[in-house]
Amino acid sequence: MVIAAAVIVPLGLLFFISGLAVNLFQAVCYVLIRPLSKNTYRKINRVVAETLWLELVWIVDWWAGVKIQVFADNETFNRMGKEHALVVCNHRSDIDWLVGWILAQRSGCLGSALAVMKKSSKFLPVIGWSMWFSEYLFLERNWAKDESTLKSGLQRLSDFPRPFWLALFVEGTRFTEAKLKAAQEYAASSELPIPRNVLIPRTKGFVSAVSNMRSFVPAIYDMTVTIPKTSPPPTMLRLFKGQPSVVHVHIKCHSMKDLPESDDAIAQWCRDQFVAKDALLDKHIAADTFPGQQEQNIGRPIKSLAVVLSWACVLTLGAIKFLHWAQLFSSWKGITISALGLGIITLCMQILIRSSQSERSTPAKVVPAKPKDNHHPESSSQTETEKEK
């Protein structure tokens, strides 16, 4: 516990102090620049947000040494980062969102990576605030309220100046064995395909995304994330402790124009993809890899390392000058203030770690199962919205 604290507190100081500086700059740009030019604000914010998010990329790449192996054909891999894309992914681990950031960073669009998330995420210190300034979409999981919020948020992206990814975790919550068992019981009672490795997708958000972005988003990236049997599952706590893991990601590209037109058909297409995803994961379990799939080299760029070293130098020099000026350690009052500051940083880190834990994620609300109605493919167990966290 002492060792963990000795690691987490310095990383927390670096992340939260630099993050507050980024948030302040984002707020100033939001107030002064966005009313005059939304595109200029977006271009500036893209660079500014990336300087913060690259710190978490550094933790994955350099501090913990997590290895992310990507399986995709050359055509798909070469398209990534060059076009707007809707990213649909299973929600397998506590750091799926960070895996997405790694892939976006490698593709050159980390600063314009977006996601649909639950509303409470935007209140997370520093990281949630940066997401709000970056136009992430936050939902309340109440479709009566979220339908219009999601529609307006999606349509607002039509004039985005750089290629963006919008991530949508249509399972609605992170995968756990307990949630899988509940999904299997529901599927059996509703005469649906019984899932083995995924949860039943909730399709309202996906249908809304396709319907509202079809005209300006050309591609859907179907990502399948899993952890090989030989690797421990990655968590935020393991990352901060510097403990490595391995993550396998399979990516398949679908053309948006090939999707059906009607809402019911779009929903069924999404369910069919998750049936196929389930079968793909069966093959992965048997082989501990994605057999017959081409592995792409995503490397480990030094950009995140350079950003972290730059932040560390700036903050260290700033701290030395501040401590010399304020003479905090020359009195009990100063020592108390310093201890309080460290306590707040530690608390914020704990909030970030706990918010990422899959066993603490809130399961989607489920209404009692009803007899299957072939004329209404939106199953009765589906929640009103999708969420990311």
UniProtKB/Swiss-Prot annotation:
Its main location: endoplasmic reticulum. Residues 357-389 are annotated as: Disordered. The chain crosses the membrane at residues 2-22, 305-325, 333-353. Converts lysophosphatidic acid (LPA) into phosphatidic acid by incorporating acyl moiety at the 2 position. Has preference for C-18-CoA substrates compared to C-16-CoA substrates. Required for female but not male gametophyte development. It comes from the Eukaryota. Residues 370-389 have a biased composition (Basic and acidic residues). The HXXXXD motif is essential for acyltransferase activity and may constitute the binding site for the phosphate moiety of the glycerol-3-phosphate. It comes from Arabidopsis thaliana. Belongs to the 1-acyl-sn-glycerol-3-phosphate acyltransferase family. Keywords: Acyltransferase, Developmental protein, Endoplasmic reticulum, Lipid biosynthesis, Lipid metabolism, Membrane, Phospholipid biosynthesis, Phospholipid metabolism, Transferase, Transmembrane, Transmembrane helix. Present in roots, leaves, stems, floral buds and siliques (at protein level). Widely expressed. In contrast to LPAT1, it is not expressed at higher level in leaves. A motif (HXXXXD motif) lies at residues 91-96. It is a multi-pass membrane protein. Pathway: Phospholipid metabolism; CDP-diacylglycerol biosynthesis; CDP-diacylglycerol from sn-glycerol 3-phosphate: step 2/3. GO terms for cellular component: endoplasmic reticulum; endoplasmic reticulum membrane. Disulfide bonds: none annotated. Pfam families: Acyltransf_C, Acyltransferase. It is found in: Endoplasmic reticulum membrane. GO terms for biological process: CDP-diacylglycerol biosynthetic process. GO terms for molecular function: 1-acylglycerol-3-phosphate O-acyltransferase activity. It catalyses: a 1-acyl-sn-glycero-3-phosphate + an acyl-CoA = a 1,2-diacyl-sn-glycero-3-phosphate + CoA. The gene is LPAT2. The lineage of its organism: Eukaryota, Viridiplantae, Streptophyta, Embryophyta, Tracheophyta. Interacts with GPAT9 and DGAT1. InterPro entries: Acyltransf_C, Plipid/glycerol_acylTrfase. This is 1-acyl-sn-glycerol-3-phosphate acyltransferase 2. It is an enzyme of class 2 (transferase).
